């Protein structure tokens, strides 16, 4: 386990150009074009950081340095969005302290189409990592199985990149995308006191395309029975009947660790 310090993982974009009024229910053609131009500039940089194993630690300053003022203003609108106006379970969460230490996980391997594939390097704050390690030791003792970390800590800047990346899958709607990918500053993945982990089996099951596939796992039943002993809780259970479209989607793979005494 290697430790990394959270240096400046959150920061302000210094902008002077006029602000956009981003459409929440579906981008118009200009907004789609702006998003596309941003992704074309950022994709090579993010891919390079993935190869280095440091994509989850990307800062807003690093994103901004690769964008025009107009593109930066567009990003800033997402950072300023009121979670209550967007809907779902969004809420502002505590940012990482500058002295937060992270464990680096870079030797995880899963099967994809029957072939071993290395999981992108992941990071977890040390308290969450230590609790995860204890929990997996107990699961292995009980079941002879364990779960891997498909996604751990993600800086707010990386979270914003992912939000934009997944928007086409959700009809370019901010509200609908937010049901599946939290806004920057609102994701448990970016808040060490409530650190999220997206689990995946060594066999490659993560439930992303069919949540029921993960829900049916013996490991999922074990988590329901024992995860709380280690400080982990399911973040997005099945929406109750008649709860409406605004509620966050069911994510059986997404659990978060709560540091003792952590308060919103």
Q: Language model features by range: what are they?
A:
Residues 16-17:
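N-terminal signal peptide c-region/cleavage motif recognized by signal peptidases
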Residues 8-9, 13:
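Hydrophobic helical h-region of N-terminal Sec-dependent signal peptides
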Residues 20-151, 165-264:
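Extracytoplasmic cell-surface/polysaccharide-interacting catalytic and binding patches
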Residues 154-160:
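Short, well-ordered surface patches within globular domains
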Residues 1-7:
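Bacterial N-terminal signal peptides that target proteins for export
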